[in-house]
Amino acid sequence: MHNSGAKEKSLVEKYPPSEPCSCEICVNYCKRPGWWTVEEAGRALDAGFGKRMMLEMAPELTFGVLSPAFKGCEGNFALNEFSENGCNFFKNSLCQLFGTGCQPLECRFCHHDRRGEGEKCHLDIEKDWNTKAGSKLIEKWIRVTGFPCASYYHMIIRSNRK
């Protein structure tokens, strides 16, 4: 029987931080930008990191996700041709967001000891973005950064939502 009075764990509770690690597997995780929750991305935006974010679109083009940008994609859509450049916050094998309170949940959680669990974390963060709160934060990011492709983004979202 389902206990309707039980509080569901927050994503931060469900996906606790891992121990820092500089092994090859973990460093490779760090090269690919991890995702913030909507709340975390809002804090990062308020902390002045908006111009270093990119807008990733869901495969079905019905919602977006703000994440640390690939080098070369800062303040733009996530473009596949820049994916090999890595995260713009990853410099000299270190994360510039580490210890700032703005490191993405997905980055804090993923670790070589948690093989296969990163995908669950990613999917749960995706659900967090496919919400009104996610859409509202993207609109704030568009205003704050002067995102040059705002009208194109709005056209994509309007034409793909049912």
Region locations from a protein language model:
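Short loop/turn segments that flank or connect secondary-structure elements
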Residues: 1-162
